[in-house]
Amino acid sequence: MDFSSSNGSEDTELSQAQIHLYKHVYNFVSSMALKSAMELGIADVIHSHGKPITLPELATALNLRPSKIGVLHRFLRLLTHNGFFAKTTVSRGEGAEEETAYGLTPPSKLLVKSNSTCLAPIVKGALHPSSLDMWRSSKKWFLEDNEELTLFESATGESFWEFLNKETESDTLSMFQEAMAADSHMFKLALKECKHVFEGLGSLVDVAGGRGGVTKLIREAFPHVKCTVFDQPQVVANLTGDENLNFVGGDMFKSVPPADAVLLKWVLHDWNDELSLKILKNCKEAISGRGKEGKVIIIDISIDETSDDRELTELKLDYDLVMLTMFNGKEREKKEWEKLIYDAGFSSYKITPICGFKSLIEVFP
């Protein structure tokens, strides 16, 4: 652009473009400020305080030195602007000067560790160096002639699953399992919204169900359903069930235990279409003896740029790049789900939005 001949409209456009560019360049600051708040336990302190807390009170509770109060204020200013804390004023008594205090908002309540809906492990996992460092190799990855190679593999020399399973007792594996368990607690919302989906089932297999967080919620809501958690042998090896909860080790790419329904929560987006098709066909085989009563229940993202608002669409597209770069997986649009489902031999499906940004997809033989 020739600045000497630019008009007011072009100047405004340039200014807005600069703001847009800088905002996205520095979005990482908001993420890291949130990570800092989570690691310090700011939401936990405010929750324990029982009411909005002043900066000096918060600094004392966090064992911060007085010299850090100004730093804490500036972090909270950004996080308050982003909706994670609410700013108010409190008075120490009649005639006393009012002080600024900070309270929780619905998003920061998701960071309170004593809450069953705590998502702090998600924040920890998503912003862990193992998730972020790979992006330094993105240009190298783009220039490599290997369609199957993920960005994670290009950067580290191993797949994410190999990295995760190197040590069955590793801190990274525990962190990943805790993140998946935390996300599973939000499944209670789905059970409330879609209770009818699970009514009438006699048995259910939760494929790649981890430690059984989701399965236990289903059993709690439907105690008559015989539930099986199906995952890799090393995941379920030391887990014990009971009469209506069984843990089975195996390989979902080879077979899936039979049941009235098969649950795939947060599974298919980890895999490309070819491998997802193999999983779905095995799930169809697992319910084949159940007649028209059998079904597969998928909980995953369904991208809909025409109906979703901008913020929701951006979140789903962010997730899509996470799946691509870490697993060579994908988040799918409705037409992609439809093709995958029909290619696996199913006759019909129904997509129902749940839990904010996920969808529940019922698939029928």
Swiss-Prot record:
Transmembrane segments: none annotated. GO terms for molecular function: 2,7,4'-trihydroxyisoflavanone-4'-O-methyltransferase activity; isoflavone 4'-O-methyltransferase activity; O-methyltransferase activity; protein dimerization activity. It comes from Lotus japonicus (Lotus corniculatus var. japonicus). It is an enzyme of class 2 (transferase). It catalyses: a 4'-hydroxyisoflavone + S-adenosyl-L-methionine = a 4'-methoxyisoflavone + S-adenosyl-L-homocysteine + H(+); (2R,3S)-2,4',7-trihydroxyisoflavanone + S-adenosyl-L-methionine = (2R,3S)-2,7-dihydroxy-4'-methoxyisoflavanone + S-adenosyl-L-homocysteine + H(+). The active site is at residue 269. The gene is HI4'OMT. This is Isoflavone 4'-O-methyltransferase. GO terms for biological process: isoflavonoid phytoalexin biosynthetic process; methylation. 2-hydroxyisoflavanone 4'-O-methyltransferase involved in the biosynthesis of formononetin. Can use 2,7,4'-trihydroxyisoflavanone as substrate, but not daidzein. Keywords: Methyltransferase, S-adenosyl-L-methionine, Transferase. S-adenosyl-L-methionine binds at residues 207-210, 231-232, 251-252, 265. Induction: Up-regulated by elicitor. Its EC number is 2.1.1.46, 2.1.1.212. Belongs to the class I-like SAM-binding methyltransferase superfamily. Cation-independent O-methyltransferase family. COMT subfamily. It comes from the Eukaryota.
